[in-house]
């Protein structure tokens, strides 16, 4: 058992901590990844202590030198975590004392693990968001550039998983790119709101030692300083916001994955996944399974669960710090790791995807042009509701005769409406169909080209802000 007296907080305790309690209380296995940012925060705080007259110049130099040594040990993988190390803060402070002696005990003057850990977490997540944003922008770029290259490929568009209208393959790709751009913007907004410095808030009442928080803000590259110490040490809005944005991002990636899973089936055959992003069956030798996409789809549920877990932790807490908040790190670290992996795999899938243009063209059946038949009558002056009915009658007549709608004779069509004339034959042309959707956001080539250019500009802007 670990002695209570060995703890940073052990002065008023006697005896030893129950071993199961020790295990439950420890977070070092999870929060080791905070090691570097914890050292950064300590270096900044040491400088603030020296400015406040708590540390001498010599003491500051010894502390900074010791912290640099600890940072080097972590980076080389030689830092030895001991059983008594309750968390990353305890581990680093214990090691600092081993290196420089009792002077290390001055570093925590006026500082609490309450403001220390939330500062560490913000520092790490700001960096993590930058990495995630870079991977996300690469995925968006891959979608956009593929859309530009394959702009002349036409496929059926679907609603309710039923054939609806002809669209450009590029329109499909860009629909996902646009959703992901919103996710990129949201990540930037979360990072901006996260950049509020909590260090210097103490346990809950603030810092009594005239610590220069502006110095801390500048040293740690935060945009502003927290307004209220009680709020600063307990707020985890930034964790919830990041997990919420991650949830939306995973919804969009899951939708993309589901679309491509369907399109890659033998029944559709629109796309073929690269072997690098597929697996086989242990029993069925003919199988090529889209496991990469299925895993992306399933990871969405994992991220949703992490958000729900953090929300449930927060919803019953009183003000200021409570140990419940220790649960935030495992959840958010897992989501960061999941997003980082998923985005790279998604980019790989899109960049190596084989498009089967011939199969897409075969699926462009004449019934997809039924709406165009109604629009033909609208352009002849018929109200749309009447034109919709007339087109529906043409579909029914073709089904009754057992022929495709484009095989109806002019006489057949005239029996439905006298407005049909010989030029109706132009309706049954796939390219003409997609080219009529010229309004902003439509699937005409001019509109898709405009979307591509606008997305390129948005990508450039987002990259500058990432």
From Swiss-Prot:
GO molecular function: argininosuccinate lyase activity; structural constituent of eye lens
GO biological process, one term: arginine metabolic process
Tissue: Eye lens.
Domain of life: Eukaryota
Keywords: Amino-acid biosynthesis, Arginine biosynthesis, Eye lens protein, Lyase
Active site: 160 (proton acceptor), 281 (proton donor)
Annotated 2-(N(omega)-L-arginino)succinate binding sites: 27, 114, 159, 289, 321, 326, 329
Site (described: Increases basicity of active site His): 294
Any single Gene Ontology cellular-component annotation: cytosol
Catalytic activity of the protein: 2-(N(omega)-L-arginino)succinate = fumarate + L-arginine
E.C. number: 4.3.2.1
Pathway, per record: Amino-acid biosynthesis; L-arginine biosynthesis; L-arginine from L-ornithine and carbamoyl phosphate: step 3/3
InterPro entries the UniProt entry points to: Arg_succ_lyase_C, Argininosuccinate_lyase, Fumarase/histidase_N, Fumarate_lyase_fam, Fumarate_lyase_N, L-Aspartase-like
Note from the entry: It is uncertain if this gene is expressed.
Record's function text: Delta crystallin, the principal crystallin in embryonic lens, is found only in birds and reptiles. This protein may also function as an enzymatically active argininosuccinate lyase.
Homology family: Belongs to the lyase 1 family. Argininosuccinate lyase subfamily.
Quaternary structure and partners: Homotetramer.
Name the record gives this protein: Argininosuccinate lyase
Species of origin: Gallus gallus (Chicken)
Name of the coding gene: ASL2
